[in-house]
Amino acid sequence: MLTLYSFRAMTHQGLGEFEQLVLLAIVHLRGESYGIPIVEEIERRTGRQVARAAVYVTLRRLEEKGYVSSWIGDPTPERGGKGRRYVEIESAGRRALRESRQLADRMWGELDPASLRSR
């Protein structure tokens, strides 16, 4: 039987909801993944306002977990000669997303819809 503890051990570290949203935005963006487009993608798809700082902190944490990798692009004049930090999802990040989805699907699949109705 898969428990939350064994799930986290299996994935090395569990994914929080916001980490999932950031990873999914990176997948949707297909190559143009850096801070601002990730923020915009999450806002567009969820209707939530997202702080840039929250995305940058999450990207750093996802990189530490080995779920994304990053590199600095070419310098641009509009950034004062600095390059953007691009990110891409790694196979471990894709696997963590799949496992997270499978766990949620199992939890939802076993839930009686009546238990969510207001009393």
Map each language-model feature to its residues.
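Amphipathic alpha-helical dimerization/coiled-coil segments
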Residues: 92-119
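Alpha-helical DNA-recognition elements
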Residues: 61
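Short, contiguous hydrophobic alpha-helices characteristic of membrane insertion segments
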Residues: 11, 67, 118-119
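Exposed loop/turn and edge beta-strand positions of beta-sandwich/beta-sheet ligand-binding modules
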Residues: 83
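N-terminal helix-turn-helix DNA-binding core of bacterial DNA-binding proteins
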Residues: 12-56
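Beta-hairpin "wing" of winged helix-turn-helix
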Residues: 65-80
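Short, intrinsically disordered or compositionally biased N-terminal tails of bacterial proteins
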Residues: 1-12
